[in-house]
Each structure stands twice: as structure tokens, then as C-alpha cells.
Amino acid sequence: MADKNSQAPVLIAGGGIGGLVVALTLHQVGVPCIVFEAVAELQPLGVGINLQPNAVRELHELGFDDALLDTVGIQAREWALVGRNGNDVYSEPRGRLAGYRWPQYSVHRGLLQMLLLQTVRERLGPDAVRLGRRVIGYRQNDGGVTALIERRDGSTEQVDGRLLIAADGLHSAIRAQMHPQQPPIQWGGAIMWRGTTPGVPIRSGASFVGVGSLRHRVVLYPISPPDPATGLATINWIAEIT
């Protein structure tokens, strides 16, 4: 049983950024794995997110150098808090400019996910990410774990693995089964509107700018370099009420 289990793949529930990075990391250390994703087609959805230097370090270790990450975002240079009168309250450098060995990146979440998906398929094979398959539960056994999987047509299958990793998001079915007494998700009271629009980047050209009050604020930052033809970048914006 031990020999059989040592050859079984690690099963990953969820093909988001976390699940795909786990798959690449396991492959890098020689551990076979399979990713199961509920949607029938992964698309570049979402808006801007930030990768702090320690996260970029892990991507560098996986072979995503600055040149590759530059295809999905830009290196952040500054954070600035600005008063409603337009004067600076506080500002500081970010990434390498702040003394880190790695940059901080502002990226489009969907473009990063597509880059990770492409890389997983190139390194692990086209069947490494199985779409249209939602992990709805699991059964522990002496040799590892059996994942219970629901297909898009309503049929089910069972897949054996040595380990099951729950990367299936906020409403994780695996977490719900593992911790049935867990209380429901609690809303913290904040409301956020998020989006992207074309615009001219301000200050350093790669700055986070926050303006507003304790309860109402807007944050703006570019997630692409300016288009040479228009001078416009993709600007991520967040309007928040707390």
C-alpha cells in the first residue's frame, strides 16, 4: 500500500491562482498532481491585485522572472496617501525601491491566472488541469484520500490520491466537510466597488494613490504600462465604504 500511495498524485481542488501555483511547486519537486476546476472554461476574469515581494520571490523560484511578469502587470514604485485637499499625508517606496530583493507587482488577476494555467499545461501536460469538475467531498482511507467529483452534466466520479489540497475558495466544500461546526462567513461591513478604466498614470507612473476619509476612500493604481500610441494605461480603482 505504501508503494502504491507513493505513486498516487496529489489532488488539488480549485484552479485559481493558489491551486495553480501549488501544482507548479509540486511539479518542481517531483510530486505528481492533478488540478480539478469547477468551471468549464477558465477566462481572464477579475481586476487588479498586488503581489508583495515575498510572493514574487516564490514566482521567481518557479521560473517567472521580471520579463515574464511584466507581461501581466507592472512593478509598483510608490504608495501615497493624499488628503482631500490634494496634499500628501504620507508616501513610501515599494518593492526593490524599498530595499527588498524582489519587486512588488500590480497585475491583472485574470491575466496572471491565464499565465499560470498556460505554464501548468506546458510543464505538467494538457490533462493536468481538468475543467468542469467540482470537488464536492472526500473520503479518507488507509492509502490516502478519495475525492468525490461532480461533472458539469451532474454525473460523478471518484479519484484516488495521496493527499487532497483545498484551494476551492471562500465557499470550500472540503473545508465545510472537514469543519462541519464552522460558523457561517461573517460580513465585516465594508462595501467595495472595483473596476478598471483607461487613464493616464500619475505621480511616478506606478504609484498607489489613496484619497478620502476614515470611512470613505478611493484607491487608484495602474496595472499595465501606458499604450505608446495613446499614453493610457489600465487603471485599477477601488471605491470603499467602511
Regions found by a protein language model. Name each.
Residues 2-10, 54-178, 183-196:
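Conserved N-terminal helical subregion
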Residues 10-12, 33:
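Conserved hydrophobic helix-helix packing surfaces used for dimerization/oligomerization
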Residues 14-16:
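Glycine-rich Rossmann-fold phosphate-binding loop(s) that bind the pyrophosphate
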Residues 19-20:
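N-terminal Rossmann-fold NAD(P) dinucleotide-binding loop
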Residues 27-47:
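Glycine-rich FAD pyrophosphate-binding loop
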Residues 40-60:
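Conserved N-terminal glycine-rich FAD pyrophosphate-binding loop of Rossmann-like flavoproteins
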Residues 82, 207-242:
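Active-site substrate-recognition segment that forms the wall
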